[in-house]
Amino acid sequence: MREVIIYTDGACSGNPGPGGWGAVLLYGSHRKELSGFHPHTTNNRMEIQAAIEALRALKYPCKVKLYSDSAYLVNAFRQNWLRTWQRNGWVNSRKQPVENQDLWQELLEAARPHQVEWLKVQGHADVAENNRCDELARAAIAAGTQG
């Protein structure tokens, strides 16, 4: 199984507001950068979208180390929030509908073919690839809001 390292980040200008996401995929000596824009969204939605798009970009089942500075994203897997939400019919501990259920379901589908290890990276802590994802996300916002 191919081993891939992925870094992801999401950003929003206002929360909610225009948002962008960025991802860097590393496989051996290969590197791929992805980014995208949404005109009205939240930071958390862009964090999830970055992971979705990065995993969808993989052509084969892979062993993935996915790094994100989003505790929301990483903890959903590492602390089994997603499993609990699914078991409870997508209702959280406060008996409210889980926010971003649509994207969580897309992410689960995108992750299904892969063995994903979800890892937290300190935000803005001089991790080059995480910083690059932030640049990609912010550039997507800038490009999407011009004119």
UniProtKB/Swiss-Prot annotation:
Cellular localization per UniProt: Cytoplasm
InterPro entries from the UniProt entry: RNase_H, RNaseH-like_sf, RNaseH_domain, RNaseH_sf, RNaseHI
Domain of life: Bacteria
Cofactor note: Binds 1 Mg(2+) ion per subunit. May bind a second metal ion at a regulatory site, or after substrate binding.
Reaction(s) catalysed (UniProt annotation): Endonucleolytic cleavage to 5'-phosphomonoester
NCBIfam families named in the record: PRK00203.1
Protein name listed in UniProt: Ribonuclease H
Native species: Symbiobacterium thermophilum (strain DSM 24528 / JCM 14929 / IAM 14863 / T)
